[in-house]
From Swiss-Prot:
It comes from the Eukaryota. The gene is CWC23. It comes from Kluyveromyces lactis (strain ATCC 8585 / CBS 2359 / DSM 70799 / NBRC 1267 / NRRL Y-1140 / WM37) (Yeast). GO terms for biological process: mRNA processing; RNA splicing. This is Pre-mRNA-splicing factor CWC23. Involved in pre-mRNA splicing. May be involved in endoplasmic reticulum-associated protein degradation (ERAD) and required for growth at low and high temperatures. It holds the Pfam family DnaJ. Belongs to the DnaJ family. Residues 12-84 form the J domain. Keywords: Chaperone, Cytoplasm, mRNA processing, mRNA splicing, Nucleus, Spliceosome. CDD domains: DnaJ (cd06257). Associated with the spliceosome. GO terms for cellular component: cytoplasm; spliceosomal complex. It is found in: Cytoplasm; Nucleus.
Length: 270
């Protein structure tokens, strides 16, 4: 292997001698003494008589490359270094400069208008999730419906006192709620009467509907059907039925109606 072959095949002689050259400073610091030292050091393991490599061809190639690298750098180091700098270090410097420019551009890149719009839409979605009490984990597929499972704010208004035939399963709140749903009475147990232990044949439970409209519908059902289920001995509202009844229709004041609907042609009828 001669100098021409090295240049044509882009052979890094310093790598063969295990000398790391990353820039011009490293290249200029490589002395003939260091080259000689590395050659003697590697000869202890790469010489055919001392190598542990079982493949003789590999052993011979490694030894020939080491000898060639030492000889060329001993005789033509100045010429080789000029070529090495232009071939390896120049390309490395260009790559480093491109990398630095790219990294700097990423840091200085301003957020585009489209990205700002995405952030704004994401913020709007989060606000909707909070408003409708939807778990944040569902943000990709939100269903904007209000949570009706929470405790009704008008619990006392929508409360019923219910006397039931005394059965073991009715003492279990979860089972009793399931039973109410099964017989199409949309109410949720709030608490049991403290006197149930003293009752022999019946028990009293207090349950509420989820809103006033549902409460009115239940009251109308009671009025029409009289009996909801044989096990329900009494079903009475905590608030008298009359409080939900409006026998007279009163037209809302036009000025107030226009404020609410922003139109005097669409008044509220009570």
């Amino acid at each position: 292997m001669d100098l021409a072959h090295v240049k044509d095949n882009h052979v890094d002689l310093y790598r063969i001698l295990h000398i790391h050259v990353n820039d011009n400073e490293h290249l200029n610091s490589v002395t003939p003494t260091l080259i000689n030292k590395q050659f003697r050091k590697l000869s202890l393991t790469l010489h055919p008589d001392k190598s542990n490599e079982s493949d003789l061809n590999i052993t011979r190639d490694r030894w020939d490359n080491l000898q060639s690298a030492y000889r060329i750098l001993s005789e033509h180091k100045k010429e080789y270094d000029i070529w090495y700098q232009r071939t390896f270090l120049h390309s490395n410097r260009e790559l480093l400069e491109k990398l630095e420019i790219s990294e700097k551009a990423k840091k200085e890149k301003l957020i585009s208008y489209d990205e700002i719009e995405k952030i704004q839409r994401y913020g709007q979605t989060l606000r909707k999730l909070v408003h409708f009490e939807i778990p944040i984990s569902d943000w990709r597929n939100p269903s904007f419906t209000e949570n009706t499972d929470d405790l009704n704010k008008l619990t006392e208004t929508c409360l019923f006192r219910i006397k039931l035939v005394k059965r073991k399963e009715y003492n279990n709140e979860q089972k009793l709620n399931e039973w109410f749903r099964k017989i199409d009475i949309p109410i949720t147990v709030q608490y049991y009467s403290e006197n149930n232990d003293q009752r022999e044949d019946d028990l009293v439970v207090y349950a509420s509907a989820r809103n006033v409209q549902t409460t009115i519908e239940i009251l109308r059902t009671i009025e029409n059907e009289k009996e909801l289920h044989p096990d329900i001995l009494e079903f009475t509202p905590a608030v008298e039925f009359e409080h939900f009844s409006f026998k007279e229709k009163v037209e809302l004041d036009p000025s107030l109606g226009s404020i609410i609907y922003n139109s005097s042609d669409n008044p509220i009828i009570m």
